[in-house]
Amino acid sequence: MEKTSVLIKSKELMEIYELKDGVPYFKTYLSGQWISGDEWQDVISPIDLNIIGKIPKLNWNQIDDTLEHIYRKGRWSIRDTPGEKRLDIYKKMASLLDKFKEDFVNVLMINNGKTKSAAEGEVKAAIERLLRADLDVKETRGDYVPGDWSSETLETEAVVRKEPVGVVLSIVPFNYPLFDTVNKIVYTTVIGNAIIIKPPSSTPLPILMLAKVMELASFPKDSFAIITIPGRDMNKVVGDKRIQAISLTGSTETGEEVVRNAGIKQFIMELGGGDPAIVLSDADLAWAAQRIAAGIISYTGQRCDSVKLVLVEEEVYDTLKDLLIKELTKSVKVGDPRDPLTTVGPVIDVKTVDEWEKAIKDAVEKGGKILFGGKRLGPTYIEPVLIEAPKETLKDMYFYNKEVFASAALLIKVKNIDEALEISNSRKYGLDAAIFGKDINKIRKLQRFLEVGAIYINDYPRHGIGYFPFGGRKDSGIGREGIGYTIQYVTAYKSIVYNYKGKGIWEYL
């Protein structure tokens, strides 16, 4: 295997790091300044666990100064930039992402362990999200409220404005560092908020490159910053009163920790998932098997909307099981994501694979039967696993109760849709679900009772750029992400009431 290293060809992007002994030391961006560090954090490729770069480990004084600058100046700089200009900036960012596409694809492959097609897909999605910011604009409009619906408010009227809350902290996950950051930038700043971005410690490089793109696109320099500190040091930041809203994509445990420490703020959180796929007796089984297999193995299961439970009506269980095993056998090729034949690359780190192994052992000890995969092929490489799980012990299994961020699915035979509903809804998570079948009455009942944020009919769950809103119920999140839908969580409503009593403007009957 060829040793991993960061390959950046664009001169503009090469300005954000210095090579020392062959290792790139990246700077971070704090409100108009590129900052190096007194301390450094290693960035490790999941492909071979090689150190591919170092990023600054900021201290509290640096973060405090940045918060103060953005609170005092930056939140007004972005608000005073006309909306038309903000849209132009997004378009420039999209153009620059396209210009630097090769560099971003290479870094996503090396830093995230993504296959080339997956990395290209993320860059494409980021570009499309920037270009579709115009669809968010209509949600920045306010309302007019007449006063003649109450005797107390006769001869008055009000305008209800939607205003930016001020400063938004955006905490980005490791799995889609470029797209998720772009998405958070658009819905946060399109209405005029300043943004502070906390990149994932494991995959920060695409975000630091994006900061350069923002600078080149003339994004208001005082209005954004990238704070590179470990997640364990974030409690003081999330609790800071200068931050008015927090946007987080991450685990349920991280979300709970943020809520405990943040105080009174607005939240938008997309948290733990791992979705059920329900297969009805009249489903197109070949199609269902193909789509479910894709939902299990896509990005090695490191997606919040990855398929983790497969619930199959007993009449077609054996057939679906055989077809699913065949699809996995045909689809899975584990290896170096730089190899164009690879379909399943590495998991992000060793500890996640350790947890995956532990969960498999737990499932087998509780009566589970491995139908496919389940082998560890290296420190960060796995064979996606399919486990036949008995209903009697299912709810005691680690995989059922905890989202494991690697390819794994439990296959369960159910008598009917009521049993499928009970098993699905008994989990603490409620992000998405998939239903495969034709019976509209069964599908309609499942739609009504599934406690999830989105349901995909005859396909596996995937959120894309957010044309359709998504988000979790129960422990899977707060609020909804989606084009035009998320602005409400980073918005303050302000009612401005005009009193015209006795001015002769209205003559009521």
Curated annotation (Swiss-Prot):
The active site is at E270, C304. It catalyses: D-glyceraldehyde 3-phosphate + NADP(+) + H2O = (2R)-3-phosphoglycerate + NADPH + 2 H(+); D-glyceraldehyde 3-phosphate + NAD(+) + H2O = (2R)-3-phosphoglycerate + NADH + 2 H(+). Catalyzes the irreversible NAD(P)-dependent non-phosphorylating oxidation of glyceraldehyde-3-phosphate (GAP) to 3-phosphoglycerate (3PG). It is highly specific for D-GAP. Gene3D superfamilies: Aldehyde Dehydrogenase, Chain A, domain 1, Aldehyde Dehydrogenase, Chain A, domain 2. Belongs to the aldehyde dehydrogenase family. It comes from Saccharolobus solfataricus (strain ATCC 35092 / DSM 1617 / JCM 11322 / P2). This is NAD(P)-dependent glyceraldehyde-3-phosphate dehydrogenase. GO terms for molecular function: glyceraldehyde-3-phosphate dehydrogenase (NAD+) (non-phosphorylating) activity; glyceraldehyde-3-phosphate dehydrogenase (NADP+) (non-phosphorylating) activity; NAD binding; NADP binding.
